[in-house]
Amino acid sequence: MCGIVGAIAQRDVAEILLEGLRRLEYRGYDSAGLAVVDAEGHMTRLRRLGKVQMLAQAAEEHPLHGGTGIAHTRWATHGEPSEVNAHPHVSEHIVVVHNGIIENHEPLREELKARGYTFVSETDTEVIAHLVNWELKQGGTLREAVLRAIPQLRGAYGTVIMDSRHPDTLLAARSGSPLVIGLGMGENFIASDQLALLPVTRRFIFLEEGDIAEITRRSVNIFDKTGAEVKRQDIESNLQYDAGDKGIYRHYMQKEIYEQPNAIKNTLTGRISHGQVDLSELGPNADELLSKVEHIQILACGTSYNSGMVSRYWFESLAGIPCDVEIASEFRYRKSAVRRNSLMITLSQSGETADTLAGLRLSKELGYLGSLAICNVPGSSLVRESDLALMTNAGTEIGVASTKAFTTQLTVLLMLVAKLSRLKGLDASIEHDIVHGLQALPSRIEQMLSQDKRIEALAEDFSDKHHALFLGRGDQYPIALEGALKLKEISYIHAEAYAAGELKHGPLALIDADMPVIVVAPNNELLEKLKSNIEEVRARGGQLYVFADQDAGFVSSDNMHIIEMPHVEEVIAPIFYTVPLQLLAYHVALIKGTDVDQPRNLAKSVTVE
């Protein structure tokens, strides 16, 4: 969601801040701003509604000089998107940027008004600026003021604070929203995502929950909320910002759809050996833990939740392990009964999804056997806090609507299923079929991508529609969910997905000539049942678009469009059938002229509740 970048150096830092913000644009935002302080304490602040490029243009018109600065991209939570609500916020000489939500901002606002403070924005962040200012007036250093102010905040925050009168220091505090310090030579940096700092450093310290950091050019000191100094290990990162430019593609999403064959190859690299899945990266004790697993609980949000839903079918049918999948925001606020020897699996592209992280932390209190994170970002909070972790190795995903992160999550999950089936002593043919299918998957997707022009032609039929219905059965039902999510995310068409067997239990009432119905139809044991559901739609005049196996025996008619798909191995069919639905959503959005890579109101990494 929001992005933070801070720098303290002997050189001008404005361009470092702007480049950091550019690297965080993919997370989603509606406004941007920065503040820079020079050695004499002169502070310059610029804020703009819209893209970082508009802020950069303003910085060219009003050159910013100074070695200390903080910058921010805002995704509105409290207060509409506007320049006055954009960060940084100030209270006299105190300057603040903040990610998260301060839940008790209203009573704090009233207290501060009673003390004479005037609020100029609608944001909860301005409360932090005035509160630190008030505490500083009570005496002591900026660090002491921050240590007194922070315990008064309830909610999630990652915040960076500077005092323009003392430009030699930055203060940062983290609770529920990530912050990482970048270590340089005679200069230091801070950001909400290490990607922002890769041009200036490879050495990082990840702040932990409750940490408060004091950063100067030559030192970093970290304290807990009591003011006691704590030690945090610095690491050398090999993370690559490999998004590059869009090349021949119009959008990052299109590029990332086409990158999926190579992304899946990268996910598989080093993990298949002698016809078996090799997950030795999990460490020497992983087999002992995994062999005890009698139940799997999966937590995720959004697209990751849909991948978890697919894997439930795999864990149960192929590994014989009962599996439950739950939306993380629901799990964390209900009283749940923990099954015996239950493994907690969390799924997140970013590894910073607030609800998923909170669910992981809750699982440790509830007594789960262990935790395993499946993630695309090494060093993320989810990875650091889990017992075991598997990286998807999808490469940087810029488009807000997930594509290659989803299919590589499924690839990792299927490898884990193979591993567990072997540990459970099941028939070796299960793992053999999974490995064979996964090795064939990249070429199968390349075949499918050759159908792009056919799908593009169909997209015209959707451009004037307001609703769409997706249907699937078995492990294709979650793929229908994912297809509906993609269409609504980027084309703004209201789309719903149902298990096809539920058609008569409500959704059939929606069917008419203006309701496109998209069906995924691999040639499996559920095909005949699915054909009956399709006939129910045809009989009521619905417009059908069926992505069907070439051997499934479908014939196009006036109200049924058949898009033939190459035959694929059954075990990989859910991954394969995801791709045409991604392309359909992309082309519909293109016709409608929406912002494909950064759809309205959405963020790539949801770091608040």
Swiss-Prot record:
Claim: Lipid metabolism is one of the keywords in the record: no
Compartments where found: Cytoplasm
NCBIfam families with a match to the protein in the record: glmS, PRK00331.1
Enzyme Commission number(s): 2.6.1.16
Domain SIS: 286-426, 458-599
CDD domains according to UniProt: GFAT, SIS_GlmS_GlmD_1, SIS_GlmS_GlmD_2
Enzyme class, spelled out: transferase
Natural source organism: Escherichia coli (strain K12)
Active-site positions on this chain: C2 (nucleophile), K604 (for fru-6p isomerization activity)
Known function: Catalyzes the first step in hexosamine metabolism, converting fructose-6P into glucosamine-6P using glutamine as a nitrogen source.
The organism's taxonomic lineage, starting at the top: Bacteria, Pseudomonadati, Pseudomonadota, Gammaproteobacteria, Enterobacterales
Keywords from the UniProt entry: Aminotransferase, Cytoplasm, Glutamine amidotransferase, Repeat, Transferase
GO molecular function, one term: glutamine-fructose-6-phosphate transaminase (isomerizing) activity
Cysteine disulfide partners in this protein: none
Protein name listed in UniProt: Glutamine--fructose-6-phosphate aminotransferase [isomerizing]
GO annotation terms (biological process): carbohydrate metabolic process; fructose 6-phosphate metabolic process; protein N-linked glycosylation; UDP-N-acetylglucosamine biosynthetic process; UDP-N-acetylglucosamine metabolic process
